[in-house]
Amino acid sequence: DVFKPGDHGSTFGGSCLAIAACAATLSALVRGDYAEHAAKVGAYMEQALAKLPHVEEVRGRGLMLGCDLDDAAGDAHDVVARALGAGAVINATGAHTLRFLPPLVCEEVDVDGLIEILSDVLA
């Protein structure tokens, strides 16, 4: 009778499954060359974003990118909503700024899909 119901355990405490998932993730990060991959795919994405209509500037590093839209594009939050409706999850950090943070395993084909959606949304 040391513990009463609710005294021991939690939904937020560490678990063996969470530790195993974390260890596997860290192991994959150590083995992989994600920095080089992010630089390569990020450069591809930066060039593709710069060619879109209404994009004034693209900046960032690797796969962490942002772009500024001209006034004709409308509010960036509306662009985000339309992109989400078409299947792309992006973020607006201001009235004219979009932010992109794709996963490190993102490939050029994934960038192509995003660019296709944004091309339609910004047309």
Tell where the protein language model's regions lie, with residue ranges.
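Conserved N-terminal phosphate-binding loop of PLP-dependent enzymes in the Aspartate aminotransferase
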Residues: D1-A123
